């Protein structure tokens, strides 16, 4: 028995000043999931009709907690690598010659393998390939050199060969002693110089690097050398302001020794977040609302008032017939408690979430429930002035219910003088003839509800987030006041509550007036807590901007639809009574409150990167119209989304809005100028700048069709042949003479194909030893090396595909220009046992495709030129230096408990 009593006492929690039972406990992420479920029910009603005529969409409710964890993981990722040696960017292919080798720029070799093959009729694949190639540039160049291997040579510090970025060890065994000594002398000259960057000692040396990679490296190094000191000061100063607003002390533990001379620090993200970046996303109002709930809303309990309040006012008689007395002992169901959650969500997000009444025939037939809801609804909600918690329909229904309650004479009969209009509450009641018209809803002035004659929105000291400067003051309560629940609310009142008491007394409802008079302290504590939650915890970049907030009520009244329409949730009549008898009491602050700014910064940074990607991709159709004939803006939108982090996509698509974003939404967002500065954005913009030359992406439109005989040299002098390092490639040193080039557009080839003369026309051009260029379409280029004769599909491959078929007595032809093009290098080898005609065939072999790229991808060099590519300045940080990413310091902090919790 004692154990049962102990378990019962554990289940029933009470506050020091209230003896009501604790009903449930809700945290921010849990409430966000609940809110998302309820919002999705409303959103689906609108979307369902549209989706019945289109494709099916997965409407499962996402896991908000998992999304937040993924974003935190995203914040921990580094966009740069710390390495000891850079990547090998130049390699050498050994030929039979002792003084000549082939030098290969490995950047172009690797870039040729990135992405899919481009075709004319798959624009989304083209966009995706471009993004992959740009990300490849950014990834290869985002490195920081630290603790590079060095050696001592005659008192000088010299870089080890692997640091230089040139691979030549495979060449050394075939060189003469003289050549090896020459290379060794050049290596001994790779002296490490001592430099000073941002008051830090560094090593400076000359290495080899491809131009696109070096641009990214140089931009990253410039970002570090710029120190970002002012940005850090701004971020920390802003965090202190935010901590003052949210009662959070931000720890500077991570920042205590970062200014030491042995520390190099990097700040990859910045604060404050630009709110325009977050709110410019198309159809994002619901997603931002859910993120605001999940990251900021505290964990709380729904607590009932002291039961003695109702026992000494409403149920003091043995026989009770009044509506309030009837409902006093009622117990809420699970669905009704869910409605209570909706009501408090609507109170915490005024204007963004508004309430309407469920169509429930059972409750509409119960007059007691409706009457009680009509009274408490006027004391719970705000309807007009600056914002509203209700729809116009619900406000009118509450007016009708209050009208019925005042005219319900169950104790004594009072005098009523009816007005001429027949509107709800158009009468005067009681001995003093109280005019009840003042309690009829007026959204323009807020009369009849909590906003009546009250300043419930004010602007005072500047808020940390510039877009949300408003302070909500339900019942005129200032959120800066400290709440002592044992005494707070005593002697406090506001206009609507006073008028309600006056009207109840005038109507002869003395017991109910006494009940509300006793409930006033509990009621004021309720709204004081809500004010604190709204103005402190819920203040974030996901808060609705002031201009949108101020437009919500006028747009609702006018029936205008804007970017941030309110979400309407349905509640039952009786849930208003249960909500009035429960107060949301915060017990624990949100676990993510101190890291919310970092989450916001990561999200805004990723959005900015996506916007930059889409801006550049939107220009592609104008730059390369031949390869994007069927392209639409939705194609590059999908391509960017597919290559974006899953967590960011999940946040953007919390309400499944991506299925309904149109081209207008998309292009408007792309063209808006707002961006969130970050290291990732800086490197992404530099990568796009490097990719403006599409040949650096191994894409080219300079592909020609020309019949050329594969060389078959005679081996009269094998030794001389081997020393020359003979090779053949279909890569042109320069474009062909323009007067010998025939430009084949799509119109020309269609005309000739329709006449059945396409192949004959090309054959005539080839016989005249001329060149054909097929349109200006971009093609994917691959680089391959062969020690023997390449396969026939490479040698005789054509720079187009031409297929014909016959169907129904008609001939059809399909022509595609965008095909994969291969640049091949055939290295000739000869043995001393070969005869002079060993490489000669009876019938010649022809190659049909020639490519011109204005880049030195492969070149034959002499041994003395192996290290000629060492022309880039590199900065390396010494091994005893620490490279410290202080981005995580932007989330270190300790939540302060509310003074009275």
UniProtKB/Swiss-Prot annotation:
UniProt keywords, alphabetically: Virion
Top-level division of the source organism's lineage? Viruses
Q: Entry's SUPFAM superfamilies?
A: Reovirus inner layer core protein p3
UniProt GO cellular component terms: virion component
Q: Where in the cell is it found?
A: Virion
Q: What does this protein do?
A: The VP3 protein is one of the five proteins (with VP1, VP4, VP6 and VP7) which form the inner capsid of the virus.
- What is the protein's given name? Core protein VP3
> By which gene is this protein encoded?
Segment-3
